[in-house]
């Protein structure tokens, strides 16, 4: 992760921070606070500590990842060379704000879903920002969600385009089973109740019901139950699930709801860095 963080800082600084170089002498030590300006769930504290260590900036934690935030609360106190603190300020805040926004939205969605389905999981998708996947998925985890796949090698997930090329679900599942380790689960994305049954009969571990209405999902689960297949698979719902309908989907009885919404549409939590004084 530090390679990614270093590159972010290099991209932000360019050749030098010309304003700070003009105004502040190297060796000027300051104390600064990172403060929240609104409510939320904090995430990115450990990332901030990684950045601070890289530049010999000491940190006092007032909040840990996953803690609730109110407006005006201190999250971290930094002490170090003013030039270093000002150099990393924007990158540190950007990551913390983005991660905190995702954690906040994830926790909200999880609470809504579990109000009607106590054991349900809320999972991310791979609809993440290139280069920021790890940070965004970690934020989902901090908010209480499931990371789902980090990468393509985490789980064999047979999607509609795979099936379109191979020709049918049964052959796709068989060929994946023959190719991957027994330690990897096989998930099949389907768009109809009939295909959900076919995927379960073919031996899928997870069946993803994509872009189905809550009513169709209920009918699909009933059909799997009627055929004695329901206990053989984890059923996941995805596609078009947002804050205004998550309870409807959770109440169907699926084990997992996966949402691109929690990483793609989260509003960053407003944080600021304030220099408290010279040290």
Swiss-Prot record:
GO molecular function annotations of the record: nicotinate-nucleotide diphosphorylase (carboxylating) activity
Family matches, as InterPro entries: Aldolase_TIM, NadC, NadC/ModD, Nicotinate_pribotase-like_C, Quinolinate_PRibosylTase_N_sf, Quinolinate_PRibosylTrfase_C, Quinolinate_PRibosylTrfase_N
Sorted UniProt keywords: Glycosyltransferase, Pyridine nucleotide biosynthesis, Transferase
GO annotations of cellular component type: cytoplasm
Catalytic reaction(s) noted: nicotinate beta-D-ribonucleotide + CO2 + diphosphate = quinolinate + 5-phospho-alpha-D-ribose 1-diphosphate + 2 H(+)
Matching SUPFAM superfamilies: Nicotinate/Quinolinate PRTase C-terminal domain-like, Nicotinate/Quinolinate PRTase N-terminal domain-like
Name used for this protein in its record: Probable nicotinate-nucleotide pyrophosphorylase [carboxylating]
């Amino acid at each position: 992760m530090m390679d990614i963080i270093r590159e972010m800082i290099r991209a932000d600084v360019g050749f030098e921070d010309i304003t700070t170089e003009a105004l502040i002498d190297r060796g000027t030590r300051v104390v600064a606070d990172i403060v929240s300006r609104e409510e939320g769930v904090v995430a990115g504290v450990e990332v901030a500590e990684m950045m601070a260590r890289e530049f010999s900036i000491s940190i006092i934690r007032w909040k840990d990842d996953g803690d609730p935030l109110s407006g005006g609360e201190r999250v971290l106190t930094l002490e170090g060379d003013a030039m270093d603190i000002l150099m990393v300020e924007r990158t540190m805040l950007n990551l913390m704000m983005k991660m905190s926004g995702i954690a906040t939205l994830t926790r909200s969605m999880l609470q809504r879903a579990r109000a009607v389905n106590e054991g349900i999981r809320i999972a991310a998708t791979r609809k993440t920002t290139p280069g920021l996947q790890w940070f965004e998925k970690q934020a989902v985890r901090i908010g209480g969600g499931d990371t789902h796949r980090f990468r393509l090698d985490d789980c064999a997930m047979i999607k509609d385009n795979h099936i379109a090329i191979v020709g049918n679900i049964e052959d796709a599942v068989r060929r994946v089973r023959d190719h991957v380790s027994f330690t990897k689960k096989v998930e099949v994305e389907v768009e109809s109740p009939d295909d959900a049954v076919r995927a379960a009969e073919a031996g899928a571990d997870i069946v993803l019901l994509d872009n189905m209405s809550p009513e169709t999902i209920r009918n699909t689960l009933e059909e799997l139950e009627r055929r004695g297949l329901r206990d053989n698979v984890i059923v996941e719902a995805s596609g078009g699930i947002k804050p205004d309908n998550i309870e409807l989907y959770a109440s169907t009885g699926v084990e997992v709801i996966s949402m691109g919404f929690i990483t793609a549409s989260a509003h960053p939590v407003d944080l600021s860095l304030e220099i408290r004084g010279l040290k």
